[in-house]
């Protein structure tokens, strides 16, 4: 049997209203930087119109992700927006091996700041392209997962 690897699929779920519309404005540059920085990757982008849609897109991406095989990058879920999007991505990828990329584009971006993700949206994209990863501890609060460094 021959296995063919087409490269990883990155699913980017975006809250375009985050940061007063900032996420929508920077999305073209984010997608360019991801595609240039990860030339073998496929990028699927979903601009969501509601919390429910964003949640479903995150869950679907995590469920459909292919794991890494020797010498390759795994399919990944990327979320872009404010702390609410970070929370959705975290809950979708928890208890899986699916890598989660966080791209802050909200107003405060407290979650990313607490994890040491600095440099705003461009810095987060550079970190994703570099392949840097970190595991974080999770706790459950009223049935929902929360993460921290």
Predicted regions and their residues:
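ATP/NTP phosphate-donor binding region
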Residues: 1-77, 87, 123-126
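Glycine-rich beta-strand-to-loop/alpha-helix junction loops that act as flexible
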Residues: 16, 80-82, 103-105
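Short amphipathic alpha-helical segments
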Residues: 24-26, 89-93, 113-115
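Conserved beta-strand-loop-alpha-helix hinge of the TIR/SEFIR fold
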Residues: 76-96
């Amino acid at each position: 049997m021959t296995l063919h690897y087409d490269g990883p699929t990155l699913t980017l779920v975006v809250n375009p209203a985050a940061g007063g519309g900032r996420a929508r404005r920077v999305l073209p540059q984010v997608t360019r930087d991801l595609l240039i920085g990860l030339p073998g990757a496929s990028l699927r982008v979903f601009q969501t119109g509601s919390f429910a849609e964003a949640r479903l897109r995150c869950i679907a991406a995590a469920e459909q992700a292919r794991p890494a095989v020797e010498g390759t990058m795994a399919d990944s879920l990327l979320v872009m927006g404010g702390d609410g999007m970070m929370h959705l991505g975290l809950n979708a990828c928890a208890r899986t091996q699916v890598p989660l990329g966080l791209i802050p584009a909200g107003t405060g971006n407290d979650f990313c700041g607490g994890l040491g993700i600095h440099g705003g949206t461009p810095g987060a994209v550079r970190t994703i392209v570099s392949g840097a990863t970190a595991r974080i501890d999770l706790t459950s609060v009223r049935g929902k997962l929360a993460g921290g460094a």
